[in-house]
Amino acid sequence: MSRVAKAPVVLPAGVEVKLNGQEITIKGGKGELTRVLNNAVVVSQEDNSIVFGPREGVANAWAQAGTARALVNNMVVGVNEGFTKKLTLKGVGYRATMKGNAVGLTLGFSHPVEHALPEGIKAECPTQTEIIITGCDKQVVGQVAADIRSYRKPEPYKGKGVRYADEIVRTKEAKKK
């Protein structure tokens, strides 16, 4: 059995926590995040740490406590340091530009694609073939990166498309006559 929930989440300097029943709000330098935790989890704040435990009489309470601890830890890291995803475009004529609060993409379609960014997410294009997405909510940063990648996933023959910077695309060999 995993022991994730037994370790407390240590709060760095400059991070505030508000507990209101099962709702937890974490405020830091990069922003503020709120989440409602499962009823099977007991949450308490002790000094500069948050402690998680199972509620008595609930079957999967330890599993839920471990999940809650991981989610809250990601919230603390997000409001303190933030999260970043980097995408690269590979292909002839594939380009990315910033258009206000949207990312403009030229991906070989008959029309340009514009992806609007949700609140709290920033993107920048240091070059025409790179997109860097940053924000304090890990889930939203990952979802925006996945949405942009889904417009043109890397194809298996030449590897053209939008990919994560650390992604390895396995290429196939072309069919022989």
From Swiss-Prot:
<dbReference type="GO" id="GO:0019843">
    <property type="term" value="F:rRNA binding"/>
</dbReference>
<keyword id="KW-0687">Ribonucleoprotein</keyword>
<dbReference type="Pfam" id="PF00347">
    <property type="entry name" value="Ribosomal_L6"/>
</dbReference>
<comment type="function">
    <text>This protein binds to the 23S rRNA, and is important in its secondary structure. It is located near the subunit interface in the base of the L7/L12 stalk, and near the tRNA binding site of the peptidyltransferase center.</text>
</comment>
<keyword id="KW-0699">rRNA-binding</keyword>
<comment type="similarity">
    <text>Belongs to the universal ribosomal protein uL6 family.</text>
</comment>
<dbReference type="GO" id="GO:0002181">
    <property type="term" value="P:cytoplasmic translation"/>
</dbReference>
<dbReference type="InterPro" id="IPR036789">
    <property type="entry name" value="Ribosomal_uL6-like_a/b-dom_sf"/>
</dbReference>
<dbReference type="InterPro" id="IPR000702">
    <property type="entry name" value="Ribosomal_uL6-like"/>
</dbReference>
<dbReference type="GO" id="GO:0003735">
    <property type="term" value="F:structural constituent of ribosome"/>
</dbReference>
<dbReference type="GO" id="GO:0022625">
    <property type="term" value="C:cytosolic large ribosomal subunit"/>
</dbReference>
<keyword id="KW-0694">RNA-binding</keyword>
<dbReference type="InterPro" id="IPR020040">
    <property type="entry name" value="Ribosomal_uL6_a/b-dom"/>
</dbReference>
<dbReference type="InterPro" id="IPR002358">
    <property type="entry name" value="Ribosomal_uL6_CS"/>
</dbReference>
<dbReference type="InterPro" id="IPR019906">
    <property type="entry name" value="Ribosomal_uL6_bac-type"/>
</dbReference>
<protein>
    <recommendedName>
        <fullName>Large ribosomal subunit protein uL6</fullName>
    </recommendedName>
</protein>
<comment type="subunit">
    <text>Part of the 50S ribosomal subunit.</text>
</comment>
<keyword id="KW-0689">Ribosomal protein</keyword>
